[in-house]
UniProtKB/Swiss-Prot annotation:
InterPro entries: EF-G-like_DII, IF2_II, IF2_N, P-loop_NTPase, Small_GTP-bd, T_Tr_GTP-bd_dom, TF_IF2_bacterial-like, TIF_IF2. The gene is infB. This is Translation initiation factor IF-2. Residues 529-696 form the tr-type G domain. Residues 538-545 are annotated as: G1. Its main location: cytoplasm. It is found in: Cytoplasm. It comes from the Bacteria.
Length: 1038
């Protein structure tokens, strides 16, 4: 049956902590607490270990055969204590008699109750110390325990204060029978052959007591025969003493002629007076009162020293002595990797921890030994004779309070006579918390999913919230514990705090499905040749669309508003039995995103450069897009038929942009073309097909389709129409499609060039697709899935993310310097005086919306805030007019018209609707709208100067200044600055201007007039009046 360690400790009369250490030494691991359970086998193993330890430290003494013919050693005379106490000394029965007959021969010995080990139960019998005297050969014992030639018995007494023996203190400082006095070792005789010898009488008895020689303090611990120090208070000795084995102490037998040394019971006071062993153990002051009252009436015990041989435990085998073999060595303990890693995390090394534990144990043992004086039993104190009487203490609760204040508030033990014997308190172990992380290191990296909050990051990384918040504030981020942190911020935190963590984004259905589709590698056996995708890039009005019209055989230029391309187009044509896909991009500055999309989906980029203009800003942008896409570049030098063009100048400019012509040893092919006359068209087409053959473009038509959305629009009769280009696989009618925030099933597809319906589209094929729920974003990738619910979930997640970004608003960044300026000016917390321009934008395609947004981003002004309330694809509806009326917004329509309801509501409520078909016209009107909402600029215009010649005072009117206009003119409603003695003393509004008696609008130079100022009558002669006016001038964004 399992047993707790503390229950086994009570059974073995041990301390629970000591038994825990014994369990560890016995080889039983995982039992570091007194509440741990031990099985029957483990308990038996612990008992066997304790028995083995006791047998090893206490060897069984050799039995001495008793002989009557052997003379005994002389016994030293015992000091007579009757003079001090008035009572006769009693004998102390140390140990138990070797034979029952020997105990019966002593009729004066008091009856002792016998326990299981043969030890007397009750109070420990006091031991009488005898002075060192000269040997008395005439005092012969009738019996001798051993012959002269026989080996002397070795008797060990327990060194710990047991219940029945009382021979030593728990701290190991009690003196056993084998203690040395004056450098001589005492050798006692057996109890049967040592009769009590009366000590010398006192002076009152007629005999002079011999003078005790001065004794020096002997060492407390006894020495073994081999000279090795056996320290008192050892674990095996204490266990043997508490388990009933009385053979722990050792007494060296006397040799003939050597006197018996004094038996000591005091701990460290070796040179004090002899204690009275028969008086009650009261306080010193109470003992003095009892001595004055008279002698004690209690029965005095008869003291007798019985030095009988103490047999060892019968069930324990004799263990070899310490000198019989080499000293035991500790096993080599190799440090594991976990321990080494734990040391790096703040854990102490095993050796350092063991040394610290040993030092703490020695320190506690030392403190216990210093605070314990002559303990005969646990918690009982023996008061020496020479102790000075203490001061009279306080009574009642005051005494207890004072005791607690000086640290003596322990448990109080009351003696049999009602007096306090000893105050002691059990010291509790003090727990010191150290700020060191003692957790074992992780065996693998911590994974943190992003985005996460600051709290989640701290819990995952093991950092405190205060440290993370302090680091984020140091980075200039004012966040709270629930704020989200992105991937970059988490990386900065990990670097700052030296964390070895793995950051990963949360797994979603999109990542699971879309990533699998994108990363699926095609089998080389399934790849077939596909048509190349050729994109025309260049500056506006350089002839891109004209070149494409000549190659394709159509005329798109005439249908474009303003003669410029404002939409991206894609066509697939067959030329000499070989298919080529062409993509036309706008060249206007506003269509940067369209050019970037065209460069990303292309295989070959055709850079169209006008021979008369050369490299222009949008040409440089197109070069950067093509280089970023890492595609071959072919330069079409257009308009070569114009007079005065210099092809070498254009090629020099291309070389400056790292495009070296093949004619000059580079790798860029330059084809001279003319779209109007058709010059160089065949050469350009052959060059493109040759480059396609060299690169061997291929795709797998048997897999699910994926590609890019080039453009999307909302049509009234067909709904959402998306222009897609298939990059890999085959797209069929009925496929489930997800493209950005849009999803749906393919209902119909049309050819982009002819408009004919088609049922499937292979690689490098542009199509117009119907069936999506909303217009997808231009540039979004599309994928074909197997389940409509998965497509709906992915599209919904994308739409939610887009909504969160749009609703997040714009956070104004305030630097510390601007914050200080606002604080000093008292403008902190005040809203800026800005004018808001609300817009509702409707366009025919997603690409047009992107172009308009790009143009609006140019008009960033601190006094005007442009807010786009809604942007969408399709015509202007009644809801748009209602929203514009409620928010005082302007509706901008690009290539769309309002319906009848929207037009009538706009006329009724005064909503402004502006329609455009060319992007730069829309840009000019938006600029005018913004400039019209700017505050006009005030300019000061100087008009003239007048000198005050004479001053007239009229009671009802005021002071009139007669002036002479010396410069310029004085006009009505102007302002006047009054200058006197070279400085301006005031600035006032002109109230009245008269010439003779008539009010006039203006007085020219050289004329005299009368001037009256508003609110100022202190005009004096010789003052100078300066006339000026403030004009408001409309401001420009430039």
């Amino acid at each position: 049956m399992p047993v707790r360690i503390y229950a086994l400790a009570k059974e073995l009369n041990l301390d629970s902590k000591e038994l825990v250490d014994v369990v560890k030494k016995a080889g039983i691991t995982g039992k570091g607490s007194a509440l741990a359970s031990l099985s029957d086998e483990e308990a038996q193993q612990v008992r066997g270990h304790l028995a083995g330890s006791a047998a090893k430290s206490e060897p069984k003494p050799k039995a001495a055969p008793p002989t009557k013919d052997t003379p005994t050693a002389p016994v030293a005379p015992v000091r007579d204590l009757s003079g001090a106490t008035g009572r006769k000394p009693s004998a102390i029965n140390v140990g138990r008699p070797s034979k029952p007959a020997e105990a019966a021969d002593n009729p004066n010995a008091p009856a002792q109750p016998i326990r299981d080990g043969g030890r007397p139960v009750g109070k420990p019998a006091p031991i009488v110390r005898t002075p060192k005297l000269a040997p008395a050969p005439e005092a012969k014992a009738p019996e001798a325990p051993a012959a002269d030639g026989s080996p002397k018995p070795e008797i060990r007494l327990p060194k710990t204060g047991g219940v029945g023996t009382g021979m030593a203190s728990p701290s190991g400082r009690g003196i056993g029978m084998g203690a040395k006095t004056d450098g001589q070792s005492t050798k006692p005789e057996s109890a049967a052959s040592a009769p009590s010898v009366p000590g010398p009488k006192s002076d009152s008895g007629g005999r002079k007591a011999p003078e005790s020689p001065k004794r020096e303090s002997a060492p407390v611990a006894s020495s073994d025969d081999d000279g090795s120090s056996n320290k008192g208070g050892g674990l095996a000795s204490r266990i043997a003493g508490r388990m009933g084995n009385n053979s722990s102490g050792r007494v060296v037998p006397n040799t003939p002629g050597t006197p018996l040394s004094a038996v000591r019971r005091d701990s460290a006071s070796a040179g004090g007076k002899m204690r009275s062993l028969d008086r009650s153990r009261n306080r010193p002051e109470e003992a003095a009162k009892a001595g004055d009252a008279g002698k004690s009436k209690k029965r005095e015990p008869r003291i007798k020293v019985n030095l009988a041989q103490l047999p060892s435990a019968p069930a324990k085998p004799a263990a070899p002595t310490g000198s019989s073999g080499p000293a035991a060595q500790k096993p080599d303990i190799k440090l594991t990797r976990d321990v080494i890693e734990g040391h790096k995390q703040g854990m102490k090394a095993p050796l350092a921890r063991l040394e610290q534990d040993e030092a703490d144990k020695k320190q506690r043992s030392k403190k216990t030994a210093e605070g314990t004086v002559g303990l005969a039993g646990r918690g009982k104190r023996v008061i020496d004779e020479d102790e000075k009487p203490k001061k009279k203490g306080l009574a009642g609760m005051a005494s207890a309070r004072a005791e607690r204040q000086r640290g003596g508030g322990g448990r109080r033990i009351v003696g049999s006579d009602g007096g306090d014997r000893h105050h002691y308190r059990r010291s509790r172990p003090r727990i010191r918390r150290k700020g060191v992380n003692t957790a074992a290191p992780r065996k693998e990296k911590v994974q943190i999913e992003l985005p996460c909050t600051v709290r989640n990051f701290c819990e995952g990384s093991g950092l405190s919230v205060a440290d993370v918040m302090r680091t984020l504030m140091g980075m200039g981020m004012m966040v709270n514990i629930n704020a989200d942190i992105d991937f970059e911020t988490a990386e900065l935190l990990a670097t700052e705090h030296d964390l070895d963590i793995e950051l990963k984004a949360a797994e979603s259905l999109e990542q699971e499905l879309i990533t699998e589709i994108e990363e699926t590698a095609d089998d080389p056996d399934t790849l077939v040749a596909r048509p190349p995708v050729v994109t025309f890039l260049g500056h506006v009005d350089h002839g891109k669309t004209s070149l494409l019209d000549h190659l394709v055989g159509i005329n798109v230029v005439k249908g474009e508003a303003g003669g410029i391309t404002q939409h991206i187009r894609a066509y697939k044509i067959d030329k000499d039995g070989r298919a080529v896909t062409f993509v036309d991009t706008p060249g206007h500055e506003a269509f940067t995103e369209m050019r970037a999309r065209g460069a990303n989906v292309t295989d070959i980029a055709v850079l169209v450069v006008a021979a008369d203009d050369g490299i222009m800003p949008q040409t440089e942008e197109a070069i950067s897009h093509a280089k970023a896409a890492e595609v071959p570049i072919v330069v079409a030098l257009n308009k070569i038929d114009l007079e005065g063009v210099d092809a070498n100048r254009v090629m020099t400019q291309l070389t400056e942009h790292q495009l070296t012509p093949s004619e000059w040893g580079g790798d860029v092919e330059i084809v001279r073309t003319s779209a109007t006359q058709g010059t160089g068209m065949d050469e350009l087409l052959d060059t493109l097909l040759t480059i396609a053959e060299l690169n061997e473009y291929s795709a797998n038509p048997n897999r699910s389709a994926l590609g890019v959305c080039l453009e999307s629009e909302q049509q009234g009769d067909r709904g959402v129409v998306a222009k897609l280009i298939v990059q890999n696989g085959t797209l069929r009618v009925g496929d489930i499609l997800v493209c950005g925030p849009a999803h749906g099933r393919v209902r119909a597809m049309q050819d982009t060039l002819t408009g004919k319906p088609i049922t499937e589209a292979g690689p490098s094929t542009p199509v117009s697709l119907m069936g999506l729920d909303t217009p997808p974003g231009a540039g979004d990738r599309f994928h074909v899935l197997k389940d409509i619910s998965q497509a709906r979930e992915i599209a919904s997640a994308r739409e939610g993310e887009s909504s969160r970004q749009s609703l997040s608003g714009i956070t104004t960044k305030v630097s510390f310097d601007s914050f200080q300026e606002m604080l000093e000016d008292g403008k902190l917390g005040e809203s800026a005086d800005t004018v808001k321009l609300n817009l509702i934008i409707r366009a025919d395609a997603r690409g047009s919306l992107e172009a308009i947004d790009k143009e609006l981003s140019k008009f960033d002004h601190p006094e005007v805030e442009i807010r786009v309330l809604q942007r969408s694809v399709g015509g202007i509806s009644l809801a748009d007019a209602t929203l514009a009326s409620a928010s005082d917004a302007v509706i901008l329509g690009f290539n769309v018209i309002p319906d009848d309801k929207a037009r009538s509501l706009a006329e009724e409520r005064g909503v402004e609707i502006r329609r455009y078909d060319v992007i730069y016209k829309l840009t000019d009107d938006i600029r005018a709208l913004i400039e019209g909402r700017l505050k006009p600029e005030e300019r000061v215009v100087e008009l003239g100067r007048a000198l005050v010649k004479q001053v007239f005072s009229i009671s009802r009117v005021g002071t009139i200044a007669g002036c002479y206009v010396a410069q310029g003119s004085i006009q009505r409603n102007c302002r006047i600055r009054v200058n006197r003695d070279g400085r301006t003393i005031g600035d006032y509004q002109l109230d009245t201007l008269r010439r003779i008696k008539e009010d006039v609008k203006e007085v020219p130079r050289g004329m005299e007039c009368g001037i009256r100022l508003q609110g100022f009558n202190d005009i004096k002669q010789d003052d100078v009046l300066e006339a000026y006016k403030i004009e408001e001038v409309a401001r420009k964004l430039d």
